[in-house]
Amino acid sequence: MRIDLCALERNLGKLKYFMPKSRGYIALVSADAFGYGVEAAAVRLMLSGADAFAVTNVSEGARVREVGSGWEIVVMSSSLPGEEDEYFENSLTPVLVSCEEIARFEKKAEELGATLAVHMRLPTVGETVPSPEEAKKMLDALLESKRLKLEAFCLLGTGTGAPQEGAKPDADFVEYAKMKTDSLGAKIFVHHSDVCDVSALPFDRALRAGLVLFGMKPSENSILKGFEPEHVLTFRSSVSQIKNLPKGATVGYGRTYTLKKDSRVALLSVGYGDGVPRNASEKMDVIIRGKRATVIGRVSMDQAAIDVSDFDEIEVGDEAIIVGESGGISIPIEEYAGRLGITPAQALTSITKRVARFYKMLY
């Protein structure tokens, strides 16, 4: 994998110009920054103007904290009992979803004689965690707490493939929260994904930017529709063998594919052990010498076969682009994932650690 950190930096800069003025930009770097490598990505984003970071759990948060202090790191998933110490040790910000969580963090803060910035999940229509009733109790408790400092509400999306990607905030709770925070003079903001419509929320806002920073185009439902990020990733392999095979020969792991004519077949040094799905036969192309070639036969752990019958020139060692651009031809991650029937995030996070990451760091 080649990862262009310069393009990552430019994507954040372009995003700031694209969006209207907001409170800030929270870089979502879950799952090892979607497989790009969280340490390298976080350092570059810190240097490029990211205001804060969002991760899935405390382990991810600790990795980001190791590479930089001074940035807020928001842990999006609810905490587990016993994890409270790690939040205080690494200055992580929990997103609280229950009164029980508040009690745990309040107790730990009292033991340590410390304070902790916290966020609270905003209740939404159709979701039950937290319910609007519990959310009101949570808000009251946090606004009264001397140890836990409520900074923000967290508005989640519902995920790709849902009937409505952007969750709708519970209007009754929003009205209650506005009344309570105004009466106390509390300055609370809302952070949200790019598929959430927050235009009616009476709070300052911050955008959680994830895949779009790493080169993925926003969905049709996104508030970033029309934004064109630069590609950050090149996923590549190389040709390891080339053979001329007769009609009727079988190809691929388990010999599941039968050639319909005399063919020239090449093997690539990549397989499901690297993150290429086992069922990629006739669903996946690669680019070699400026031409596309299609995967045929079941992918094994270490190899994949491609049909190169129409190639005039091809040699062992030739580069094969799986995701990226070569010779004026491009296979974006959206195409790669779409043809395989998976999401771009799933495709990226499936690329295993066996695949070395090489970073372009300088312009």
Positions of predicted regions on the chain:
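A charged N-terminal "starter" segment
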Residues: 1-93, 115, 149, 357-363
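Generic structural signal for well-ordered alpha-helices
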Residues: 5, 9-16, 42, 61-62, ...
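Conserved, mostly hydrophobic/aromatic
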Residues: 8, 30, 64, 120, ...
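Active-site loop/helix belt of alpha/beta enzymes
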Residues: 31-36, 43-44, 108, 115, ...
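Conserved beta-strand positions in the central sheet of alpha/beta enzyme cores
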Residues: 54, 74, 95-96, 154, ...
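A structural signal for short, hydrophobic beta-strand segments that form beta-sheets
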Residues: 75, 150, 239, 295-296
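A generic, well-ordered mixed alpha/beta core segment in the N-terminal half of proteins
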Residues: 90-127
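C-terminal accessory subdomain/extension
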Residues: 246-363
